Amino acid sequence: MADQKKPLQGGATLPLMAMAALGVVFGDIGTSPLYTLSACLSAMSLQPTAVNLQGILSLIFWTLVLVVSVKYAWVIMRASNQGEGGAMALTALASHATGHSNRLRWWILSIGLLGAALFYGDGVITPAISVLSAIEGMEVASPAWKPLVIPLALGVIIGLFMVQRRGTAAISHLFGPSMLVWFLLLFGSGLTWIVADPQVLIALNPWYALQFFGIHGIGGLVILGAVVLAVTGAEALYADMGHFGARPIRMAWYFLVLPALALNYLGQGALLELDPSAIQNPFFMLFPAWATIPMVVISGIATVIASQSVISGAYSATRQALLLGYLPRQAIIHTSASERGQIYLPLLNWLLMVAVIVVILWFRSSNALSFAYGTAVTGTMLMTTILVFFVARHSWKWSLWKAGLFCGFFVLLDGVFFGANLLKFVEGGWFPLAIGLAVFTTMSTWRWGRGILASKLYPDTLSVEDFLSSVTPGDPIRVPGTAVYLTMREKAIPHALLHNLKHNKVLHERVVILTIKFEEEPRVLPANRVVVLDYGQGVRRLTARYGFMEHPDIPEILKSAENSDNLWNPLDTTYFVSRQRVIPTAKASLSLWREHLFAIMLRISANATDFFRLPPNLVMELGDVVEFSHKVPDAPKKEKTTQQ
């Protein structure tokens, strides 16, 4: 149950790593004070009376404590998959923990995919609501700025996505110090107003949270849909664990972020108790009038950093999903020579940009967007809690009552938050759910489609031994050089090899059948990377294993498999790859529209040449046309994921 701690890189001290984590992990949750309290009051059209404020502030504070401090920082961050966290890492852990039950694995996989899919709904709304809420601060300085809010927000968003291709390596070292300044401002501004009205501190008593529901009855549950805005971004504590390790993240949360957030929310409450007219924008009115524009600039920087963290998280999650075989291959561009984690996915970048622009133009204000925010976040939290139950039972060896008590409490809590957000479905809660459903459908369609495609391509597997038994010294003709054939199946003869033999009547002197397998773990030790099987007659099979945080290097694989009899010369090597095209039919187990969706995804999938970064002048691509008419079982057996 102990954490697998990531060593502090470059001799960095724990406080320095904690400060670096501020710029990556806490941007989303750190900018929540911009809009959370306003959203809570507008959710039920409440007046900022002392009783209402005490109840809301108590709910916000104890939500931060229970959801972030207890659930994520104390427990879920223990679910380390070789030091990595996140939806895919947790799904892999839960799947491994359950043993050999194929049906249970299938359900765990579905829950994990749904949780990962809902993350994209959050990823679209976070940049929109964060940037809008920061720029809306200009209205506090002068209402004349109001017509410029939308154009300025769109300009910031478009600029943010346009620079992604260049990467953030040059300025990322400034993110941590910038967010440190932000949290110190949250701390100081909140404390100033608490000193002016210390009575607000009674909201730390959980009794006032319960009293709120006593006053407002069952209708008071609506407020939870806005209260949860205070913990948006909590998943980042776990998702970014692989970058910094658990200790620096916990240190930053307990010693700076939590106190700063709590004091700022309490400070906003104190301000509203003393001046109810500040309901217009309680965050920016914490500061004197002369500081409004500087705070708009500073909050703008903080929200851009928060948005950048979400975008980078989307890149990372998508990369993991496509390497594990849940999404079509896409171009992955590394934007930093020194930081392997700094990547850029062009297609995803433009899809996200268009989606965020649509959100801003549709909702037009952070207050309206608050109705859309929350459904995806709470849905992801609920899926995470369910997966942690299996990890706690089978990996941590918790007793049934202990795992059931902990996870049961948080399933109930997450379920109440999720239900409260569903009450906002018509006002905008449908939007992130629609995005999550679309992503889940895409992932599941690709996964099932690949299974059907593999069963059609390899219905009767021809083994290498059977193939070689038909090869004689003069037939077929052996030509000089090395042929590398990429294939999905470990034991099958690649289609490209059979096509080449059928049409060209030749076989290379050296034949390498290469299968690349992506394991459900972040990394594979180099010693366990490549398995070589020599069949004789110049034919060898190489099976290379990679984790979902790694990218294959085919030349390195071939070089590692060298021996005195098989020296690899990259200049006399030809790479043979296959590319499939499917013909949808009504006979397949997928519905016809999903078959067409799979066919489209297959067409836009990056080819093996680009994905594996093979030299184009040394690649020969052969095609297969496949009719979809194969039935697959309801709960397919688990297979190692390959992407050839």
Curated annotation (Swiss-Prot):
Lineage of origin: Bacteria, Pseudomonadati, Pseudomonadota, Acidithiobacillia, Acidithiobacillales
Family the entry assigns: Belongs to the HAK/KUP transporter (TC 2.A.72) family.
Name this polypeptide is given: Probable potassium transport system protein Kup
Topology within the bilayer: Multi-pass membrane protein
Transmembrane segments: 10-30, 56-76, 106-126, 143-163, 175-195, 212-232, 252-272, 282-302, 343-363, 371-391, 403-423, 425-445
The reaction(s) this protein catalyses: K(+)(in) + H(+)(in) = K(+)(out) + H(+)(out)
Gene: kup
Keywords assigned: Cell inner membrane, Cell membrane, Ion transport, Membrane, Potassium, Potassium transport, Symport, Transmembrane, Transmembrane helix, Transport
Claim: ATP-binding is one of the keywords in the record: no
Cellular compartments annotated: Cell inner membrane
InterPro entries: K+_transporter, K_trans_C, K_trans_N, Kup
Principal localisation: membrane
Gene Ontology MF terms: potassium ion transmembrane transporter activity; symporter activity
